[in-house]
């Protein structure tokens, strides 16, 4: 029997209400409530002019752009701090804080020459000039283990000496903390600072490493150099991302881990400065008149107002002209398009081609202690031991890979044209090409990957999994916890559609799985759910940080004993012993393949083929289930996003410089005209 879901059916199935939870934060404003904050809180839209007001419903856990990697939290880094290079609205790289740069292949060194620029505080007052040393101090902060930067791998992988420096201080912290790893590895330090690491494979000593050995140096106030570990082709694209931004060194030294926990502890050198942050109230950025490119900053004040029910209240406030932008969810989209008073207020966000979505299985369902973090794993009600048996079965995972019809879940957010967003790979098309101009998706084994959805094959894998798991002592139905973040528009509805569609396939004739949808917290979702192992199956996303396929391995790769990016803990399950046999082999083969691909630095075609083969093995072994590209949100907005910066990697698309606030909400016809005119 063939099961399918019509557009009408899946919309009817997606009626779950989103209820957010709030947590009080520690972030504060600069000097108390300002007039801008009061105006924003009252909800007055610009009606064309120099202010931009929007709601937000998820509390940032930090504003520290040197340590965060979350979408919301990088707003300060994107808009309040300038980068060495930036992009125009067509995706062409141009000057930023650096006016020119050159590459010395013999020494593997990039040299950047900086323009005059100033740091300003939360009142917009000049603090000090931006110097090359600010880039050096910021990178040292990123490489300090105590600050737990989420982006440290983007430095240790490419900057000469960074890996040795970082590892030494990790081992030193372990020694000072008396850490003993699960395999019995111990860390000790002598009076001279030499760290001894004693493990099952032997003993190694590590002498102290001076930061001078790291390949970042301030030659003078306006000259900065980076020395790389190899001729990395994507380095310039990496500079438009958080760990390579500057920070005022004396402030970092003064406040340490309190950097960017408030407007007062955040200095800016970008298009805007952070003027105010009141936890669960307002978030205000103001135009920075000291910025070298201030003439191209057209929005004077950016106000974000906290509203736990932004997805519901935002559209109503748009109708009253109280805010400048709101997301129009799928539950109201049809009615807005049918209403003469609102149909011309609906357009879309600019497509973000560097974000892709995929489903991850949790390979760490049981508690695990890393050296610097603890993963709690699944709650008992979701039967973690039973889940551990299930995910160890390739047949079980392939039943999901072939049983999921991504078209119906994508159609929740893209009622029309959803086929254009489907992916059978993790990496999106047109991401990069080899020296012959061949798209990366046509390199190596990725060229052989096609559509997976096939109900007959899914049931074959299900039947094989039932036989295999019954012999292993598993019980049915397998409980599958599927969480979502209630602050993400339509995620709940996508979960409902996925449950209905997948269960209709895999439970046809046998009670195979029980997908249990759970609402996670609106605030701290990643830390509470994904990074804590509180899921069985989870929709995850990844945005490329730079233009090289290695970036697409970051969610999955784990070095031995490391917690990695805390997506699925693939290697952790193997190291803990409940992932065995062919699944363990597939995991370790992938890790080895990534390490081998990373080591290829002189032949770009061989490098791309190697990464393509690794990604194909990840997918073909159903260690990940590809879903699709980021679907542009339907919006009511007064911004012409086609004026803004654009790049297929990094955070350029989040920058507001160059964008005007219009005196009307953009219609779809105007959106398309703006797109064509860019």
Report the location of each language-model feature.
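Append "and occasionally in soluble cytosolic enzymes with long acidic Gly/Pro-rich linkers
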Residues: 94, 286, 387-506, 613, ...
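N-terminal lobe/hinge region of extracytoplasmic solute-binding protein
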Residues: 55-105, 267
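Extracytoplasmic/peripheral linker and loop segments enriched in polar/acidic and small residues
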Residues: 10, 389-392, 396-398, 402, ...
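Ligand/substrate-recognition segments at binding pockets and active sites
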Residues: 122, 279, 305, 451-456, ...
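Long beta-strand-rich cores associated with HINT superfamily self-processing modules
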Residues: 636-678
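Alpha-helical secondary-structure segments
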Residues: 132-137, 221-227, 271, 300-301, ...
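Gly/Pro-rich hinge or "lid" segments in bacterial periplasmic/extracellular proteins
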Residues: 181-213, 221-222, 227-303, 311, ...
């Amino acid at each position: 029997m063939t099961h399918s879901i019509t557009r009408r059916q899946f919309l009817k199935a997606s009626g779950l209400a989103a209820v957010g939870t709030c947590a009080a934060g520690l972030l504060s404003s600069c000097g108390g409530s300002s007039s801008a904050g009061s105006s924003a809180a009252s909800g007055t839209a610009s009606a064309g002019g120099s202010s931009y007001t929007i709601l937000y419903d998820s509390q940032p856990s930090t504003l520290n752009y040197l340590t965060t990697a979350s979408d919301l939290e990088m707003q300060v880094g994107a808009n309040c701090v300038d980068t060495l290079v930036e992009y125009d609205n067509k995706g062409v790289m141009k000057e930023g804080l650096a006016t020119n740069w050159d590459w010395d292949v013999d020494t593997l060194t990039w040299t950047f020459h900086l323009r005059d620029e100033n740091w300003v505080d939360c009142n917009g007052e000049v603090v000090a000039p931006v110097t090359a040393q600010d880039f050096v101090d910021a990178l040292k902060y990123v490489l300090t283990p105590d600050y737990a930067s989420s982006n440290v791998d983007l430095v240790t992988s490419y900057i000469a000496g960074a890996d040795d420096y970082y590892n030494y201080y990790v081992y030193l912290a372990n020694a000072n903390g008396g850490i003993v790893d699960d395999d019995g590895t111990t860390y000790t330090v002598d009076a001279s600072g030499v760290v001894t690491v004693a493990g099952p494979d032997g003993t190694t000593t590590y002498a102290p490493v001076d930061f001078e050995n790291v390949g970042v140096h301030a030659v003078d106030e306006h000259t900065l150099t980076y020395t790389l570990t190899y001729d990395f082709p994507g380095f310039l694209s990496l500079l438009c991302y958080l760990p390579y931004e500057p920070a005022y060194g004396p402030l970092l030294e003064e406040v340490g881990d309190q950097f960017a926990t408030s407007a007062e502890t955040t200095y800016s050198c970008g298009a805007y400065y952070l003027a105010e942050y009141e936890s669960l109230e307002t978030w205000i950025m103001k135009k920075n008149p000291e910025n070298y490119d201030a003439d191209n900053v057209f929005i004077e004040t950016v106000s974000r107002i906290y509203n736990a029910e932004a997805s519901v209240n935002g559209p109503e406030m748009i109708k009253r002209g109280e805010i400048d932008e709101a997301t129009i969810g799928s539950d109201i989209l049809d009615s807005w398009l049918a209403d003469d008073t609102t149909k011309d207020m609906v357009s879309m966000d600019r497509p973000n081609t560097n974000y892709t979505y995929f489903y991850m299985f949790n390979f760490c369902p049981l508690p695990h202690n890393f050296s610097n973090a603890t993963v709690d794993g699944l709650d008992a009600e979701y039967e973690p031991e039973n889940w551990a048996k299930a995910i160890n079965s390739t047949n079980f995972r392939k039943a999901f890979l072939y049983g999921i019809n991504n078209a119906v879940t994508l159609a929740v957010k893209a009622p029309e044209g959803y086929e254009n967003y489907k992916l059978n790979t993790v990496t999106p098309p047109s991401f990069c090409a080899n020296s012959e101009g061949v798209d990366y998706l046509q390199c190596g084994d990725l060229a052989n990957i096609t559509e997976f959805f096939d109900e007959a094959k899914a049931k074959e894998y299900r039947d094989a999994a039932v036989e295999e798991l019954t012999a292993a002592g598993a019980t049915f139905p397998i409980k599958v916890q599927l969480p979502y973040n209630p602050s993400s528009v339509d995620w709940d509805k996508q979960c409902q559609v996925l449950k209905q569609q997948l269960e209709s396939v895999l439970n046809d004739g046998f009670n195979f799985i029980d997908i249990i949808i759970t609402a996670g917290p609106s605030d701290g979702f990643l830390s509470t759910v994904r990074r804590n192992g509180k899921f069985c199956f989870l929709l995850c996303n990844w945005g490329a940080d730079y233009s090289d396929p290695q970036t697409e391995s970051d969610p999955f790769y784990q070095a031995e004993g490391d917690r990695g990016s805390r997506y699925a803990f693939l290697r952790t399950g193997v190291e803990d012993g409940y992932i065995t046999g062919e699944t363990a082999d597939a995991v370790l083969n992938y890790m080895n393949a990534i390490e081998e691909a990373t080591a290829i630095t002189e032949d770009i075609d061989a490098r791309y083929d190697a990464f393509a083969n690794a990604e194909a093995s990840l997918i073909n072994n159903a260690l990940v289930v590809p879903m699709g590209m980021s679907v542009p949100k339907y919006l009511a907005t007064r911004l012409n996003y086609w004026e803004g910066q654009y790049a297929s990697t990094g955070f350029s698309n989040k920058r507001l410089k160059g964008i005007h606030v219009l005196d009307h909400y953009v219609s779809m016809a105007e959106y398309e005209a703006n797109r064509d005119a860019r």
